[in-house]
Amino acid sequence: VWPLPQTVQMWLEYELLKNPTVPGYFCVSTSYRNEPNPVPGRHNLIFPMFEFEMKGGMDELIEMEQELLIHLGYDASKFIKGKYLDVAKEYGTKELENDHETKLYEEKTPSFFLTDFPEFTSPFWNMKRNDDPTLETANKIDVILSGQETIGSAEREVDRTIMVDRFKAIMNGAYKDKMYELFGEERTMAEMEEFLKFDFIKRSGGGIGVTRLIRSMKLEGLM
């Protein structure tokens, strides 16, 4: 067990950085989520996950996701994109919850692309933030299909210093403290240095909850 690659995402990112001439990598794995307050029909403890890493930033990422959905039969004319803070303001809340995802489905569309997540949602340490620092948002896209977040994706950071600083700061330092507790500071930071040796290219990646995707496709009459 290694400190940083606690999900397949880090391994895929490692492979892409190691072999930058390859357009991207993907795999299907089993994911385990210990949700503190699981909602029946929404949260599964164990589920299949399709994960991918690819070249390109936010524009290329959302283009790929839309092409995937079109290939699966989703209606492109119903695709709607909205920024997190704008949607939260519309629903009179600071933080979007499960009920808001359901409302997006019932009131707007079966295919909503939620973008630009604010810092208080604790975006991961290797997610790129908006080039405008005053916005304090991450280049993150959640694709809400039929009322449930089904694809979680983001553009990756390329600045080494920023990645180290964020690794130590996210969740007010709790993530870093947990890694140190489990694996030790020396081992954790040695692995970080190994990761940071690469020449970082513009890249993105994400995970698709296969169970939720199948659920949505059935609801939309696509399978």
Q: PLM features: what roles do these ranges have?
A:
Residues 1-56, 63, 81-223:
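A translation/RNA-centric and nucleic-acid-associated enzymatic feature enriched
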Residues 71-82:
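Flexible helix-coil linker/hinge segments at domain or subdomain boundaries
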